[in-house]
Amino acid sequence: MTIRQMRLSDYDDVYSLWLATPGMGLNNLDDSRDGIAKYLERNPDTCFVAEEDGIIIGVILSGHDGRRGFIHHTAVARDNQRQGIGGALVDAAMSSLKNEGINKVALVVFEQNEKGNAFWEKQGFAIRPNLIYRAKAIADIIRMDT
């Protein structure tokens, strides 16, 4: 298994993996090929895939705004879970973010995503009960939660 930086040419395989992963929150704009191209252009060194025999089996989308890091859309293929791949992807993203001067990283997980929440707790991410996450769409977004 190899961890490498994600490229736009990985998009179709990565998107298929996201669709096959329960608990993902996708939408038609941000997660389109154009949306991911924009994200990778802004964050060229912080997004990674895990590959085995030329097949993408894991992905982590992470980036920052110069002050805080954020992790989006982390997934490992069902048959490859519980083998340390997710942790290796997180380590790669965290190391890259740290190298870019980022000192704190946040993420959002659906409350009902028990598997995802257990994974992130194991990775050392704490729940912030004193915060309420809010969002507002400023474009016509179609949600596609898995």
Give, region by region, the residue ranges found by the protein language model.
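Terminal substrate-recognition subdomain of acyl/acetyltransferases
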Residues: 122-123, 132-146
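A short helix-loop-beta-strand connector motif used in the catalytic cores of GNAT acetyltransferases and
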Residues: 37-49, 70
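Conserved GNAT acetyl-CoA-binding A-motif
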Residues: 97-109
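Conserved beta-strand in the GNAT
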Residues: 49, 55-63, 70-75
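A short beta-loop-alpha structural element at the N-terminal edge
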Residues: 2-16
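A conserved beta-turn-beta hairpin within the catalytic core of GNAT-like acetyltransferases
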Residues: 63-72, 81, 127-131
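Conserved acetyl-CoA-binding loop-helix of GNAT-fold acetyltransferases
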Residues: 76, 82-95, 122
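Conserved beta-strand-loop-alpha-helix junction that forms the acyl-donor binding cleft
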Residues: 107-116, 135-138
